[in-house]
C-alpha cells in the first residue's frame, strides 16, 4: 500500500468509558445503540452481544423510564462491553443507573432539570467516576437558539454545546465528551470544526438520522471521513435505520479506509466485467460473511482478471488474480500457487485463515520477546 503519512489527530483530554480510553491519542472507539425495548432484557442483551462480536467498543442504551432503569441493572450484569445510558428529562433515572454501574451518562444538562438536579447528577457522576456525554442535536435545539438563528446553523449548535460545557465547568466537572450532530453533512461537519477549536474535550462524531443502510452509510462516510481526515474525533457512531450491527461494520470500514484503525479483512475487489474468470462478487460476498470472526488486520485482493490483478496482489497480504480455470494466488506480493476457479471460496477461505494464524503467531512471539 502507498505509504501515506498518518493523520495528525487533534489533541484532547483523556477520559474512560468503562475500561475504554477515550481521547489523548487513544484508538478511536466505535459504538452503536440498541434499538430493542430496554425493558425486554433478553432481546437487549442478545443485541449487545451481537454488537460486541463484530467489534463494538461501547454500546448506548436508551433508558426513558424507571422500569427501563431496573431492566438496565439486569442488562449490565449480563454483558461485558461498556454501556452508555441515554437519559432525558428525569434526573432520577441518571442517579438510578449510576447506582447500577453505568459506564457513561448521555445527557443534556439543559433538559435534565433545574440547577440543583443537574448538580446532583454531576456530583453522583464525580463520586462514581462516571463520564458524561453532552449530546447536542440539530433536531432538538433550544427554542431561544432557534429564534435567534432562524434555523439550525453551525453557530447555533456551537452555542448550545458551549452552554452545556460552561455548565459542567461551573460545577468543576471535566470528565465529559461532546457531540454536535445533525442529519445534514455540511451542518454537522462545520459544527464539529468550530467546536474542535473551542474545547479540548474528546469529541463523539456522528451524522444523526443519516438514513437507511445504503444512504446512511454514504452520508456518514462523507461526513465522518472529512472530520477524521482532519484529525477530529475520538469516538464515533454511524447512525443507520438498519440492524445496529451494520453500524459497527460501517464504522470500522470508514476507519480502515482512512488507515486510522484496522480490524479484520480489508477486501480489495474489482467491480467485474466480461473479463472476469471466476465469480468475483459471489466470492467476496461469501467470504465477508464467512470471515466475520477474524479481527486480525489483513488486505486481501480479489481481482477477476490479469489486467489489474497482479498489481493489486503485489501490495496485498493475499491476492487472487483471475486466470483460465485456475487463478493465481499471491502471498506478500509473491506468486505462490494456483486455485481452482470452481472451488474458489473454500480454497481462499482456507488460505486466509492459515495466513491469519501465521500472523497471530508471529505477533505472539514478538510480544514474548519484548516481555523478555
Curated annotation (Swiss-Prot):
It holds the Pfam family GcpE. Transmembrane segments: none annotated. Keywords: 4Fe-4S, Iron, Iron-sulfur, Isoprene biosynthesis, Metal-binding, Oxidoreductase. Pathway: Isoprenoid biosynthesis; isopentenyl diphosphate biosynthesis via DXP pathway; isopentenyl diphosphate from 1-deoxy-D-xylulose 5-phosphate: step 5/6. Its cofactor is [4Fe-4S] cluster. One of its GO terms (molecular function) is 4-hydroxy-3-methylbut-2-en-1-yl diphosphate synthase activity (ferredoxin). One of its GO terms (biological process) is isopentenyl diphosphate biosynthetic process, methylerythritol 4-phosphate pathway. HAMAP family: IspG. This is 4-hydroxy-3-methylbut-2-en-1-yl diphosphate synthase (flavodoxin). It comes from Salmonella typhi.
Amino acid at each position: 500500500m502507498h505509504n501515506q503519512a498518518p493523520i495528525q489527530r487533534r489533541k484532547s483530554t483523556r477520559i474512560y468509558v468503562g475500561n475504554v480510553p477515550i481521547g489523548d491519542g487513544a484508538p478511536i472507539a466505535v459504538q452503536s445503540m440498541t434499538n430493542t425495548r430496554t425493558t425486554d432484557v433478553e432481546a437487549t442483551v442478545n443485541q449487545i452481544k451481537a454488537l460486541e462480536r463484530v467489534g463494538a467498543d461501547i454500546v448506548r442504551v436508551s433508558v426513558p423510564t424507571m422500569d427501563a432503569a431496573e431492566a438496565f441493572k439486569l442488562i449490565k450484569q449480563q454483558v461485558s462491553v461498556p454501556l452508555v445510558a441515554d437519559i432525558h428529562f428525569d434526573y432520577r433515572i441518571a442517579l438510578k443507573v449510576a447506582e447500577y454501574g453505568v459506564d457513561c451518562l448521555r445527557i443534556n444538562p439543559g433538559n435534565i432539570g433545574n440547577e440543583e438536579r443537574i448538580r446532583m447528577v454531576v456530583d453522583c457522576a464525580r463520586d462514581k467516576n462516571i463520564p458524561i456525554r453532552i449530546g447536542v442535536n440539530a433536531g432538538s435545539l433550544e427554542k431561544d437558539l432557534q429564534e435567534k438563528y432562524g434555523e439550525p446553523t453551525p453557530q447555533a449548535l456551537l452555542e448550545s454545546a458551549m452552554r452545556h460545557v460552561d455548565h459542567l465547568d461551573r460545577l468543576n466537572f471535566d470528565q465529559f465528551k461532546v457531540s454536535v450532530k445533525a442529519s445534514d453533512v455540511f451542518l454537522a461537519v462545520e459544527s464539529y470544526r468550530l467546536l474542535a477549536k473551542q474545547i479540548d474535550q474528546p469529541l463523539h462524531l456522528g451524522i444523526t438520522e443519516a438514513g437507511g443502510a445504503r444512504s446512511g452509510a454514504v452520508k456518514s462516510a462523507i461526513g465522518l471521513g472529512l472530520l477524521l481526515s482532519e484529525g477530529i474525533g475520538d469516538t464515533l457512531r454511524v447512525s443507520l435505520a438498519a440492524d445496529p450491527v451494520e453500524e459497527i461494520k460501517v464504522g470500522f470500514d470508514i476507519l480502515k479506509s482512512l488507515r486510522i484503525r484496522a480490524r479484520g479483512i480489508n477486501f480489495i475487489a474489482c467491480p467485474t466485467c466480461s473479463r472476469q474468470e471466476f465469480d468475483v462478487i459471489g466470492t467476496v460476498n461469501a467470504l465477508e460473511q464467512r470471515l466475520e470472526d477474524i479481527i486480525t488486520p489483513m488486505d486481501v485482493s480479489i481481482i477477476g482478471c490479469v489486467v489489474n490483478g497482479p498489481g493489486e496482489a503485489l501490495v496485498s497480504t493475499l491476492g487472487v488474480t483471475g486466470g483460465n480455470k485456475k487463478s493465481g494466488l499471491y502471498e506478500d506480493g509473491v506468486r505462490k500457487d494456483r486455485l481452482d476457479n470452481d472451488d474458489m471460496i473454500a480454497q481462499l477461505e482456507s488460505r486466509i485463515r492459515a495466513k491469519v494464524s501465521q500472523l497471530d503467531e508471529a505477533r505472539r512471539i514478538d510480544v514474548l520477546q519484548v516481555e523478555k
